Amino acid sequence: MLYYFYSIFHINIFQYITVRAGIAFFFAFFLTLYLMPKFIRWAMKKSSYQPIYSLAPEHHKKKANTPTMGGVVFIFSALLASLLTVKIHNPYVLGGFLTILGFLAIGVIDDYGKITKRSNQSGLSAKQKFFLQILVAFVVSLFLYEYAHLNSNLYVPFYKYPLLDMKIFGILFWTLVIVATSNAVNLTDGLDGLATVPSIMALTTLAIITYITGNAVLSHYLLLPKIIGVGEVSIIAAAFAGSLIGFLWYNCHPAEVFMGDSGSLTLGAFIGYMAIISKSEVLLILIGFVFVMEALSVIIQVGSFKLRKKRVFLMAPIHHHFEQKNWNESKIIVRFWIIALISNLIALITLKIR
């Protein structure tokens, strides 16, 4: 909307992505700070509490009366801030909104089932959730290929030329990226603030890359692919970063509210979407290294138990492994934040080395 003020009234400052991203960031931050306490009070009245997994470490039982679905609040704040600041007609913006709303719907349905039936196993079944994730991700990927005409080249760090053109198979690859990232962030969201800060870092890194990719001068200088119009999505990322910092105020240890699947599934999907449109699918391994660690620990644990009847970790995802080793929860969280910070800095450094 602010961009159209520039078009109508010729207020030049609103044509700049960086200015609108800054406005979106602070608007979403303050709106989340304002709305979250109201949501927490409402959720407690409605007994919208987070069901605790029966096999979770013993000290998690004290989290049983913590409200969940806080993701709905910070996503609403981010979406409203985005609607006020982006070019709505931009195809990459539309694809981002489609991703956010689709995965938000899946998360809300799942969270609502868990809350109403007071069980962590009573939301969507794993098969139902996976099917819906694939469906939404496929529609988004098809939209990018057919409507946004996003090129299907695959790029890798340290190499300035595309490794290969996936052509129509890019749709399947992009679907995999979105679904995998969505589930990886969801697995990470097991301790207070554990998924929140790495998500802020990943969104910030991807906002920078997306802005560069959409800028003809900067993309040429850094030898990155030039994708006209994609920089507009960095405003949505800035809005999410702002709303997440506002959410962290209440989600830091000891958490007053959890984001729920409505938050984690949506965040992960949007992070995956940003990696796709900025041609950073492979670099996403570094950008979301904490998420990769968490997801791999589950894959290794399940695979090892099925093949060898032995567990590699005391418990998976890996943050629970460290809990079982009697690490303090705050220490685990901060150390994972440090890992996320270092991996994102390395990811940014790779942009210059080509």
Curated annotation (Swiss-Prot):
GO terms for cellular component: plasma membrane. It catalyses: UDP-N-acetyl-alpha-D-muramoyl-L-alanyl-gamma-D-glutamyl-meso-2,6-diaminopimeloyl-D-alanyl-D-alanine + di-trans,octa-cis-undecaprenyl phosphate = di-trans,octa-cis-undecaprenyl diphospho-N-acetyl-alpha-D-muramoyl-L-alanyl-D-glutamyl-meso-2,6-diaminopimeloyl-D-alanyl-D-alanine + UMP. The chain crosses the membrane at residues 16-36, 66-86, 88-108, 130-150, 168-188, 193-213, 227-247, 257-277, 282-302, 331-351. Disulfide bonds: none annotated. Its EC number is 2.7.8.13. It is an enzyme of class 2 (transferase). It comes from the Bacteria. It is a multi-pass membrane protein. GO terms for molecular function: metal ion binding; phospho-N-acetylmuramoyl-pentapeptide-transferase activity; UDP-N-acetylmuramoyl-L-alanyl-D-glutamyl-meso-2,6-diaminopimelyl-D-alanyl-D-alanine:undecaprenyl-phosphate transferase activity. Its main location: membrane. InterPro entries: Glycosyl_transferase_4 (IPR000715), PNAcMuramoyl-5peptid_Trfase (IPR003524), PNAcMuramoyl-5peptid_Trfase_CS (IPR018480). Keywords: Cell cycle, Cell division, Cell inner membrane, Cell membrane, Cell shape, Cell wall biogenesis/degradation, Magnesium, Membrane, Metal-binding, Peptidoglycan synthesis, Transferase, Transmembrane, Transmembrane helix. The keyword DNA-binding does not apply. It is found in: Cell inner membrane. Belongs to the glycosyltransferase 4 family. MraY subfamily. HAMAP family: MraY (MF_00038). NCBIfam families: mraY (TIGR00445). Catalyzes the initial step of the lipid cycle reactions in the biosynthesis of the cell wall peptidoglycan: transfers peptidoglycan precursor phospho-MurNAc-pentapeptide from UDP-MurNAc-pentapeptide onto the lipid carrier undecaprenyl phosphate, yielding undecaprenyl-pyrophosphoryl-MurNAc-pentapeptide, known as lipid I. PANTHER family: PHOSPHO-N-ACETYLMURAMOYL-PENTAPEPTIDE-TRANSFERASE, PHOSPHO-N-ACETYLMURAMOYL-PENTAPEPTIDE-TRANSFERASE HOMOLOG. This is Phospho-N-acetylmuramoyl-pentapeptide-transferase. The gene is mraY.
